[in-house]
Structure formats: C-alpha cells, structure tokens
C-alpha cells in the first residue's frame, strides 16, 4: 500500500517569511549586549544564552504564529495572529528587562544591558505580523489604528510597571529625561506643522 504524502500548504506566505526571518534573527544575532559599565563595549548574548526559563516564554506565541502560516485564513485566525504577535513582543521586552535585572544583580548596579540586533529585528517582525493580521481582518482605518494600538498595550504596561527600568535605554532616559522630552516635543512640532 502506497502511503500518500501530503506537503503542507502555506496559506500565508507573508507570515511564513516573517517567522523564518525571526528564526534566523533569534539564532543568528545577539539579543542583548552586556557591559560592566557605560565606558566599556558590551558583549553580545544570544537569545538561547539568556539565564533562566525566560526564553521558553517565546515558544508558545512563536509556535502559534508559525502554525498560523499553514492554517486556512479566517477572521478568528487573523485576530489570533495579532494577539500572538502582541504577546510575543511583550515577552521579548519582558525577557530583555529580566536579563537586565539579572545582570545588574549578578555583576553590579553599574552594568549596562542594551538591546541587541536580534531584539530589534524580532520586535519589528512582531509588529509586521500584527500589522499584516490586522490588515487581513478588513477593518476600517479607524478600527485598524485602534487594533494596532492595542498590539502595543502589553508593551506599554510593561514599561509602566517598571519591568524595563534596568535596561540601559531606560537608564539613559531617566538620567537625561529633560533633554529627551524637549527633543520629543520638538520632533512632534515639526511633524504636526
């Protein structure tokens, strides 16, 4: 008896390309960079080199996103993809903040943990996956904007909770808040005028 072999059918090539790119970034680039202080260059730490069980938080939303590329299109699927991308983005942020706290307690309070290339690529890919899913939902422009704002909500909650305070980016902002705020206001004036 011949066993019929079926090859998986890709239903969302955009999402598949995003997820394959994410795997390359996750395993080929540094997720964070750790330096003993501000004056010394940091050394890159890949995602799989982070301490604790934190990286395991990424598996479920990443697996859902990969599986979604092979699932027939539906509104429920697109909503699930948007939520999974938002959760993956939040998990990436939490993981970076957690590693920063760990390094600050293990090395010294002067230790600096900055976001590496893998973080930025993965964050962008999460945003692209969410934007693609929201676009496929066929929402009106106002609702699409609202849905994409909702994708950022978990990240904003993490920021407000203080979970990202140990990251060097946040430390720099805290040290030079007036300069950052003035520059931000100036940029808004330029954009809105």
Which ranges hold each PLM region?
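Loop-to-transmembrane-helix entry motif
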Residues: 187-191
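Short amphipathic alpha-helical segments with coiled-coil-like heptad repeat character
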Residues: 1, 192-193
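N-terminal, non-cleaved signal-anchor transmembrane helix
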Residues: 1-186
């Amino acid at each position: 008896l011949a066993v019929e072999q079926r090859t998986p059918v890709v239903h969302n090539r955009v999402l598949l390309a995003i997820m394959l790119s994410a795997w390359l970034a996750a395993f080929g680039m540094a997720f964070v960079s750790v330096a003993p202080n501000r004056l010394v260059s940091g050394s890159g730490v890949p995602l799989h080199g982070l301490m604790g069980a934190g990286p395991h938080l990424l598996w479920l939303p990443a697996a859902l996103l990969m599986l979604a590329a092979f699932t027939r299109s539906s509104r429920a699927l697109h909503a699930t993809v948007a939520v999974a991308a938002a959760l993956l983005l939040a998990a990436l942020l939490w993981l970076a903040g957690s590693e920063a706290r760990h390094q600050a307690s293990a090395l010294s309070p002067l230790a600096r943990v900055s976001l590496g290339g893998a973080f930025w690529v993965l964050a962008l890919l999460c945003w692209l996956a969410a934007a693609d899913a929201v676009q496929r939902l066929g929402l009106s422009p106002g609702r699409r904007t609202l849905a994409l704002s909702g994708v950022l909500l978990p990240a904003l909650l993490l920021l407000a909770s203080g979970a990202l305070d140990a990251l060097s980016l946040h430390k720099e902002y805290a040290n030079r808040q007036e300069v950052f705020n003035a520059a931000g206001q100036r940029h808004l004036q330029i954009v809105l005028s």
